[in-house]
């Protein structure tokens, strides 16, 4: 069969058909494709490599993929047909994040054992109820489940047990007793807590209830200590020479980065912008020439406000979708009518309209590969489809809803279309932050006044 658009040759003497129009350029190949069981083009790369067990040649398979609601990783699998040795590990394909991350999961049912887990080399795993810890850099990274983490720990403890028993080592019996306790955890005989602490910020624990909030999972972002920076191989930058003062408010600065969609080199534009009736912010926009992906992010240009801000807007018609909106990285979003909550740091900082943010939220939910194909859960798929339909109704103005922005740092903003008068459909509240909120912002240990007294000699 001839290819589409080609001209088949006719009999001798026939008129020559006009040449076909040039074919459109092929779509750019993405280095990291979303993980999916139905993507036939997503095939691993096979590389012949040396087996470190028998020193014959084995096969390494590399898969560049993308974890939903997370980022890019490289899955590596080695197998040797000569000695049967095999090994699987993962590596983060992205940079070390600006902050470390700590996942605290309360395991209460067998369903929690099936949560997807990305554990990097630098992540430490703890189970406080058993006083059990797997230190950082003691295991290779893995793409597994909660049950897989425990099974891997059991295998590690059982590895040298025959030698301990042969030597009549007293620790062998205690390790056997501990292994029994770990096996009981796999049956969830009683609730327990799993903590994954990764200073690099590249580990991940799945939220099976997405886009709803997961009450069993607490995600904490924190600033790394100097010891953790050294452990990750990060060196402190030398102080730069003080440049001459420049007015950058009217200039657009550029710096090189990688596209978050296809990981190709791209340019990011950055500019300082004054928002009316608010403050200065830094807007960064990236346009990828390889795949056409566009994104923008907003960073606060000022300090943390003395009080947190909670903005509640009653959406009554489609005209509310045109309101300008600034969502900082520390701002969470809630829509009570949809039982939906978007946590801090998700989607990053954004300067857009209300419609733009709602569409970003809908896209975040509907593009989750775990809700598509044969790997999807029918009940979860129906919930997400219903969520998407209700979100469309809100955007079109056919459904009234409340839109709540809660920013402990006080650096978020929603346009008041009646300014300088009060907006009858919008309520702005200022509140005092809790201890936990100050802890997440890194304010509890920050001393900005009277710190000289601590350096003065004792009299």
UniProtKB/Swiss-Prot annotation:
GO terms for cellular component: axon; Cajal body; cytoplasm; Gemini of Cajal bodies; growth cone; neuronal cell body; nucleolus; nucleoplasm. Residues 1-18 have a biased composition (Low complexity). GO terms for biological process: apoptotic process involved in development; axon development; Cajal body organization; cellular response to epidermal growth factor stimulus; DNA endoreduplication; DNA replication; inner cell mass cell proliferation; microtubule cytoskeleton organization. GO terms for molecular function: protein folding chaperone; receptor tyrosine kinase binding; translation initiation factor binding; zinc ion binding. Expressed in fibroblast; weakly expressed in fibroblast of spinal muscular atrophy (SMA) patients. It comes from the Eukaryota. Residues 1-32, 439-459 are annotated as: Disordered. Keywords: Cell projection, Cytoplasm, Deafness, Differentiation, Dwarfism, Hypotrichosis, Metal-binding, mRNA processing, mRNA splicing, Nucleus, Repeat, Zinc, Zinc-finger. It is found in: Nucleus; Nucleus, Nucleolus; Nucleus, Gem; Nucleus, Cajal body. Belongs to the ZPR1 family. Acts as a signaling molecule that communicates proliferative growth signals from the cytoplasm to the nucleus. It is involved in the positive regulation of cell cycle progression. Plays a role for the localization and accumulation of the survival motor neuron protein SMN1 in sub-nuclear bodies, including gems and Cajal bodies. Induces neuron differentiation and stimulates axonal growth and formation of growth cone in spinal cord motor neurons. Plays a role in the splicing of cellular pre-mRNAs. May be involved in H(2)O(2)-induced neuronal cell death. It is linked to Growth restriction, hypoplastic kidneys, alopecia, and distinctive facies: An autosomal recessive disorder characterized by pre- and postnatal growth restriction with microcephaly, distinctive craniofacial features, congenital alopecia, hypoplastic kidneys with renal insufficiency, global developmental delay, severe congenital sensorineural hearing loss, hydrocephalus, genital hypoplasia, and early mortality. This is Zinc finger protein ZPR1. It comes from Homo sapiens.
């Amino acid at each position: 069969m001839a290819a589409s658009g080609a001209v088949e040759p006719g009999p001798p003497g026939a008129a020559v058909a006009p040449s076909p129009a040039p074919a459109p350029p092929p779509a750019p190949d993405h280095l990291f494709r979303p993980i999916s069981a139905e993507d036939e083009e997503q095939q691993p790369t096979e590389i012949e490599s040396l087996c470190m067990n028998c020193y014959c040649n084995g096969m390494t398979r590399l898969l560049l993929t993308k974890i939903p609601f997370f980022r890019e990783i490289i899955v590596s699998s080695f197998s040797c047909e000569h000695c049967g040795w095999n090994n699987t590990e993962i590596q983060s394909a992205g940079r070390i994040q600006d902050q470390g991350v700590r996942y605290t999961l309360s395991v209460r049912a067998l369903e929690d054992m099936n949560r997807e887990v990305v554990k990097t080399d630098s992540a430490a795993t703890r189970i406080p109820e058993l006083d059990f810890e797997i230190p950082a850099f003691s295991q290779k990274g893995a793409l597994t489940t909660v049950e897989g983490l425990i099974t891997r720990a059991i295998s590690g403890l059982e590895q040298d047990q025959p030698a301990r028993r042969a030597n009549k080592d007293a620790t062998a019996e205690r390790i056997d007793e501990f292994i029994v306790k770990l096996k009981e955890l796999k049956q969830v005989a009683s609730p327990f807590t799993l903590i994954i602490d990764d200073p690099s910020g590249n580990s991940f624990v799945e939220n099976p209830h997405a886009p709803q909030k997961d009450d069993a999972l607490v995600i904490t972002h924190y600033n790394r200590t100097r010891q953790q920076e050294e452990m990750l191989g990060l060196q402190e930058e030398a102080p730069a020479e003080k440049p001459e003062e420049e007015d950058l408010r009217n200039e657009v600065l550029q710096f090189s980065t990688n596209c978050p969609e296809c990981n190709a080199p791209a340019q990011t534009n950055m500019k300082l912008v004054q928002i009316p009736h608010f403050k200065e912010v830094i807007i960064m926009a990236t346009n990828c020439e390889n795949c056409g992906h566009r994104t923008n992010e907003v960073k606060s240009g000022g300090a943390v406000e003395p009080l947190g801000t909670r903005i509640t807007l009653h959406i009554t018609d489609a005209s509310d979708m045109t309101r300008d909106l600034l969502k900082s990285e520390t701002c969470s979003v809630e829509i009570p009518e949809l039982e939906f909550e978007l946590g801090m740091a998700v989607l990053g900082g954004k300067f857009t309209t209300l419609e733009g943010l709602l569409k970003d939220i809908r896209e975040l939910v509907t593009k989750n590969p775990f809700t598509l194909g044969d790997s999807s859960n029918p009940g979860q798929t129906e919930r997400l489809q219903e969520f998407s339909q209700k979100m469309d109704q809100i955007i079109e103005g056919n459904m009234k809803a409340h839109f709540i922005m809660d920013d402990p740092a006080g650096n978020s903003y929603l346009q008041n279309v009646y300014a300088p008068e009060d907006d009858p459909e919008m309520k702005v509240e200022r509140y005092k932050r809790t201890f936990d909120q100050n802890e997440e912002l890194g304010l509890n240990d920050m001393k900005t006044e009277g710190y000289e007294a601590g350096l003065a000699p004792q009299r």
